[in-house]
């Protein structure tokens, strides 16, 4: 069957065949480096394992960044009609493959602008790949991240995140006299409920995207049924809308923690920020957004849908670090992420390649117009 596939589908099929859970991206990185070379992109693999292909050109510099890693768990790779199934068939090998194919075609046509295509490592982990790009001061005037937005949609916003570990320690005693002791589980949960009440005037509480949301994700505490717990550790994930900066939230959390400690002097409670990310929203009227939206209409015959998602993506990090127009785009239904039913519609995948090609050409045209004003 594969001998009948076009080169773009063959590339994606092989990428899905190459099992690449986080930490095991070296084989697919070497494969993609060779593919990039064959398409006229100068490839290299950096010190953390990112594969980077470049096409020289003048300003503007455009970054296309996808990720090679997937969540763990092998799935059978199979074709069923116009669908390709397998681990990474949604999250997010089609987006990366589309970027490579689009960049290769543009390079062959002597695209005047500089293009950098990155297959990053560790996106599903701690984000080492993207962090290394930033530490090495990668330059871009526009950036597109490859994640499944849907072929006719462009993600322009993600919420920020703040992941906390709350540790509570108290003196223990016999559970037959609980009134004599502070229960570490109760105390930790009391503080957690106070955190859940933190809100800001800038929020739109009726909106899941424009409000602060919180989830208790883990709780560990207690030792024996006859002992009042003296230790409790809980983990929580809070998501922040663009109107609420991480700094603003942490300041309010600090006030809440200070007030709790003043009223609970015999309870030892510590809060650690395990991971955090600022919210990010792109300008819907930016050259990048307009260029890609134009291409969606041109290829699909429908206006692009601009999405705001309650999750958090790599574009948060780059957009808030480099302060350049940044969006997320890629084929696929994100509801299939990390499931056993990951699959991609190959017609949508092929259309996404054309959308990226036409979109980047439009971005260059709009950029040049803006420079003449």
State each model region's role.
Residues 3, 44, 149, 156, ...:
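Metal-dependent amide/peptide-bond hydrolase catalytic core
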Residues 59-119:
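Active-site metal-coordination/substrate-binding segment of hydrolases
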Residues 97-163, 368:
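Acidic/histidine-rich catalytic neighborhood of metal-dependent amide-processing enzymes
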Residues 61-63, 84, 141-145, 163-165, ...:
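Short glycine-aspartate micro-motif
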Residues 1-63, 71, 231-235, 249-252, ...:
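N-terminal helical capping/dimerization or prosegment-like subdomains
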Residues 32, 96-106, 133, 188-191, ...:
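Buried hydrophobic packing segments
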Residues 43, 53, 77-79, 216-219:
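A structural signal for short hydrophobic beta-strand segments in well-ordered beta-sheet cores
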């Amino acid at each position: 069957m594969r001998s009948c596939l076009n080169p773009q589908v063959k590339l994606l099929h092989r990428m899905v065949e190459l099992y690449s859970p986080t930490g095991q991206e070296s084989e697919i990185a070497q494969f993609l480096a060779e593919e990039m070379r064959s398409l006229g992109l100068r490839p290299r693999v950096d010190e953390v394992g990112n594969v980077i292909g470049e096409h020289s050109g003048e300003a503007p510099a455009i970054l296309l960044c996808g990720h090679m890693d997937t969540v763990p768990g092998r799935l059978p790779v199979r074709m069923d009609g116009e669908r390709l199934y397998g681990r990474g068939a949604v999250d997010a090998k089609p987006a990366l493959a589309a970027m490579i194919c689009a960049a290769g075609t543009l390079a062959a046509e002597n695209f005047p602008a500089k293009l950098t295509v990155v297959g990053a490592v560790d996106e599903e982990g701690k984000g080492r790949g993207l962090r290394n790009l930033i530490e090495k001061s990668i330059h871009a005037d526009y950036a597109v991240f490859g994640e499944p937005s849907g072929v006719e949609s462009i993600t322009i916003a993600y919420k920020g995140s703040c992941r906390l570990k709350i540790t509570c320690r108290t003196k223990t005693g016999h559970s037959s006299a609980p009134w004599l002791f502070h229960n570490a589980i109760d105390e930790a949960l009391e503080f957690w409920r106070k955190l859940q009440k933190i809100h800001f005037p800038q929020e739109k509480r009726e909106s899941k995207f424009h409000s602060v949301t919180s989830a208790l994700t883990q709780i560990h505490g207690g030792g024996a049924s006859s002992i009042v717990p003296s230790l409790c550790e809980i983990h929580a994930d809070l998501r922040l809308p663009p109107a609420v900066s991480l700094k603003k939230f942490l300041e309010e959390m600090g006030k809440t923690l200070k007030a709790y400690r003043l009223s609970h002097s015999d309870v030892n409670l510590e809060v650690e920020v395990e991971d955090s990310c600022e919210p990010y929203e792109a300008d819907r009227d930016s050259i990048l957004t307009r260029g890609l939206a134009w291409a969606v209409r041109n290829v699909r015959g429908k206006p692009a849908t601009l999405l705001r998602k309650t999750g958090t993506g790599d574009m948060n990090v780059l957009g808030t670090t480099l302060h350049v127009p940044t969006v997320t785009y890629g084929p696929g239904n994100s509801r299939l992420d990390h499931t056993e039913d990951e699959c991609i519609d190959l017609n949508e995948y092929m259309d996404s390649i054309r959308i990226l090609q036409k979109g980047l050409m439009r971005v260059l045209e709009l950029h040049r117009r803006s420079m003449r004003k």
